[in-house]
């Protein structure tokens, strides 16, 4: 999605674009995520500003491309304990709380927004600015609109193998592509050409996650849903209240072992996308293991107050994250006319339109 959004901005500014994709169609982290446009947990400052701008862009792009499935659904984080509620209260007291759309709700107020939450909780953090798109189909929808411009060419099943000159690359079919600028949006593919161009000390790491999707819920889940473990992973919630939560209310053993939080979004077909885990140590395992799914199922059922529908899909994905997690993305000129853009971490789907807009502005497109 980072590469496609660069193409989008270039075409929108009147340029001709050739997009080269290693797979026949995108099938990496850009599809294997929640489709969340996640403003609520972002760090104050540049990261929040990027996420808010990206949300504006997603909404405006969706007016032209309704098949993105954009919806301004907001999110709810149900709360059960004093320590969890204290973190939410601290979030609502932030100076940028209004920009995020934070509001602390009673359980009754939360259920008025999302009636599917019939389980046990006593309050909830509402984040009005959060939104969602359909990750499995968004790339195809964007591609169709780009092709309709007449200034966009898509070459799937090709890999860029070499930079052969200023803003010029050769692919593995032997074809050379030359332009005014080349953007290498390689996602989690950090070896090979990326290593040759950026060197062995690229400040980006790979992160593996596990997720799942269910059959249709049979009713509407009107918001995205997170659990209070998400407070432990998103920088917006850092502070004394979170320190007290971590000290006095440890995660469940499975959640701690797999560095888990609950995030949940309903798809257009009614199914629920649910996750996730975080694995940082290399080499990654190649299995998907069952304990995280059991934990997530229990948490979701406790919020819904009903059994989870059958799990239809389970998968793992890998994304690239800057080792300095405060950086929104790694953007580096690696050769004359050639830029590497990677490492947005878990914010890639959220921030990609704004990341690409920044590249376009900096390069004077």
Task: Please tell me what each predicted stretch does.
Residues 1-2:
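Hydrophobic/small residue at the entry helix of a nucleotide-binding pocket
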Residues 258-261, 267-273, 279-365:
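C-terminal catalytic lobe of FAD-dependent flavoproteins
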Residues 11-31:
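Glycine-rich FAD pyrophosphate-binding loop
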Residues 34-113:
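Dinucleotide-binding Rossmann-like beta1-alpha1 core, especially the glycine-rich loop
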Residues 165, 171, 175-267, 282, ...:
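Flavin-dependent oxidoreductases
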Residues 49-50, 77-87, 125-144, 287-292, ...:
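Short beta-strand to alpha-helix junction loop
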Residues 153-168:
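A conserved short coil-to-beta-strand element within the FAD-binding core of flavoproteins
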Residues 67-77, 104, 111-149, 277-281, ...:
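Helix-loop-beta segment of a Rossmann-like dinucleotide-binding subdomain
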